[in-house]
């Protein structure tokens, strides 16, 4: 009886160890990857393509936009760099500017802006004034 119990216990232990060794843990995507994927999902939504209102794209993808906001300061740095390096000034840049403003929270110095590049221009001017 003891031998049967011992063999069963060993078999169970070996099976548990084998299964845990085969388990692959997925790495959490970086802030940059999360933001790139989220922006791509939002701006390439065919159902919303007829809308010119960026808030429609955000409202249609609340969970995706929330993922951008959950990237924190690492995400903010990435968004600012992407806005700076972008040659465009469209929907994607507008969403990046809004996310940046929301990530800054009360520290967002820009209250009135017309486009993503406009927000960035004002942000950079105010930041430069504060660094003097």
Enumerate the predicted regions with their spans.
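Extended repeat-based scaffolds of very large eukaryotic assembly and lipid-transport proteins
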Residues: 25-132
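Bacterial N-terminal signal peptides that target proteins for export
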Residues: 1-9
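Hydrophobic helical h-region of N-terminal Sec-dependent signal peptides
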Residues: 10-15
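C-terminal motif of bacterial Sec signal peptides marking the signal peptidase cleavage site
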Residues: 18-21
